[in-house]
Amino acid sequence: FDEKGTAFLHSCLHTTSEWITIDEIGFLESNSCKYRQAIRTLMKHKQLLMVVRKQKLPFLEELRNHKDVFLVDLDQPYGNAGCIIMASGQGTRFGGNKLLADFNGQPLIDFSLNIIKNLFTTCVVVTIHREIQSLCIKQNIPVLLHTFPHRNDMIRLGLETIGDYIDRCVFLPADQPLLQKESMISLLLCAENDRNSIWRTCYGDIVGSPVIFPAEFFEELQNLPLRKGGSLVINNHPDRIRTFSVSDINELRDIDTPDDLSQLLHRNL
């Protein structure tokens, strides 16, 4: 490492590529003073993609805790996150249960159910619709059927169900069929790297859902005023908000009316 490894790292400074990949850094590499310094120098001039072992060694801790590092734990990349799928809309403007409406051959809610698979420690679909309950049971997805009328009830019930088991919670509407799984994954990775912030999706200046709240906000969310939603908590803590930009504005569009459905179907073609 003192000779060939260090020389290679120095040569990377003069490549035209902005990105350098190093696989991997562990006990042997961290014992070389010259190698450690070469890594530090390279970090100042290039974008590095590094695989770093979890050993509790000073240099490895330094790399993992560096202020400019975006850290992904390959054993648990999304952290201890839960998800509440909001599926209790009355569908008044739609003229019926919009979540069962056909969208490219699938019930509308299926797109949200597919997104959450293999991402969360635990999840629950909160709904007033028995048809949605049956659909979730068939897919082995936890579901809570209730009869409460308001958004604050839905949030409270969801957190009462899973809040004790998670460090943060995603609130995912069930009517955004063009939201991409890659966007959800990116949002989760951001929240795992900055665990103290409320994370939400955006497109330019337009903010939207899903939203991730750290556990410290659960009590406030469970005690929302009648008919109020998570936006009240967001507005109470503007200094704690961070956003992740999606690649397409249509990812943030929800469906409230048959015309909304038609427009998104046309866009999806």
Predicted regions and their residues:
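Conserved alpha/beta core of the MobA/IspD/sugar-nucleotide pyrophosphorylase nucleotidyltransferase superfamily
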Residues: 219, 223-269
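Short, glycine-/small-residue-rich phosphate/pyrophosphate-handling segment
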Residues: 58-70, 207, 211-237
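Conserved beta-loop-beta/alpha segment of the NTase-like Rossmann-fold superfamily
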Residues: 151-219
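Short, high-confidence coil segments that cap the C-terminus of an alpha-helix
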Residues: 17, 45, 120, 166-167, ...
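Conserved N-terminal catalytic core of the sugar/cofactor nucleotidyltransferase
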Residues: 110-168, 182
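N-terminal glycine-rich phosphate-binding loop and ensuing alpha1 helix
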Residues: 81-130
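ATP-dependent small-molecule kinase phosphotransfer cores
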Residues: 1-16
